[in-house]
Amino acid sequence: MGANGNVGLIRMGSWCVYSSIRRTFQIRKAQHGFSPHIITHFPGWVYCEEFGIEVQGFFCLLPDMAFHNTLIMSRLINFMVMTNHFRVPFNQPCLVGREFEYLADAIRMRHVSGDGTYTKKCHTLLEQTLGVSKALLTTSCTHALEMAALLLDIQPGDEVVVPSFTFVSTANAFVLRGARPVFIDIRPDTLNLDETRLECLITSRTRAIVPVHYAGVGCEMDVILEIASRYNIAVVEDNAHGLFGKYKNKYLGTFGCLATQSFHETKNFTCGEGGALLVNDPQYIERAEIIREKGTNRSRFFRGEVDKYTWVDVGSSYLPSDLLAAFLYAQLEAREQIQAKRQRIWKYYDEHLRDWARARGVRLPSVPSHCEQSYHLFYLLMPDLKARTRLISHLRERGVSSVFHYLPLHLSPMGQQFGGRIGDCPVTEKVSDCLVRLPLYNDLRREDQDWVIEAIWEAQW
């Protein structure tokens, strides 16, 4: 309470439980001799010496002078917003134990640019585990997709079939080469490319099909590959979500002539920013190395195959630092541990939300029996946009960060330039309005997951 007996309250949320903090106020007043004010949405114990404040749970206790200091309050609120404090964040990058060791080792070896020792370790691990002809780390999955477009020699006027329900990079990588994206709708069960709609979209100008394994659940690759083979069209798998997932006992990313991976902060295995190009058709290996090395044959030079290297083709700088590769290698080494954690979290959501979802008309993820998913994300398909909006708002009030996902690419400003119209992809349009993703990261604690589940049970719409 302040000098006038009132509590100064700045509401960053609406889930203050006043009875649970009354005793805290009394204790802090006795210990520190000041009357607290409150700011919500601030998890964990924090002490900010600069501000002279203390934080417990979701409540920030301020001395009276701090509460009335405009500069302090402005900086504090900005700090809270910028650091995105939730009791349960949507995503949190997790360490597995050897990242710092490998980073220090890479620094000691005095090779921190691309294609150092740890880059080669990552390449070998991916090639041997997945059985691909070649794996090449890149600076992002976006850049791996751009490399794929260059390798396929995509030209202006070519057409590339991509799902409308995907990240912009899936389409943009080919648009950069002058191609026209042809947007295909998704299946209502797995949210993957609807293979039954594929053949009717193919024309004489179609050069590639890009299936996206949404949430790490495999697309129906048998059908896609059969159609692609019949029309002599390349298949590039966007496997950003699906590393180590399987379709009919075969790893995702090993079906198309090329495939791409993501090691972004939000993915199962991360180095902050990064990706990989998987080459399944050996005819593309040499040119892939050239494109990745600024259009030079530098890789052949370092293997002793030529006495000097020079500019031989188009290309760019797609090599990540070996520091990033060192971090990533620690994560890839722990792949079984990471996947086991994510599997437990995913199944716990599924088990504890299934009855609730059935009663409330909500759909949970669908995984066909012939697919082994990667446990990349867990989502709810709400009845409509209004229900989705209210659930996200309710979870935010309870300190839980939940998010929607892709907006339909065919209805984006850029997509409309390629002829996209409302109604072209009706399943995508519906799913985009209804889907909400729940927190899922390797170190999500059971008590925090229970908090999320209980908050969902309480939600009304």
What does each model-found stretch correspond to?
Residues 5-7, 17, 33, 38, ...:
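Short hydrophobic alpha-helical segments enriched in small aliphatic residues
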Residues 56, 74-113, 310-312, 439:
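N-terminal "arm"/small-domain region of PLP-dependent enzymes with the aminotransferase-like
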Residues 78-79, 119-124, 129-135, 196, ...:
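PLP-dependent aminotransferase class I/II
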Residues 115-159, 173-177, 183-184, 250:
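Phosphate-binding glycine-rich loop
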Residues 150-239, 246:
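PLP-dependent aminotransferase-like
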Residues 237-271, 300-302, 307-312:
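Conserved active-site segment immediately N-terminal to the catalytic lysine
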Residues 261-262, 275-280, 329:
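Short beta-strand-to-turn element immediately C-terminal to the catalytic PLP-Schiff-base lysine
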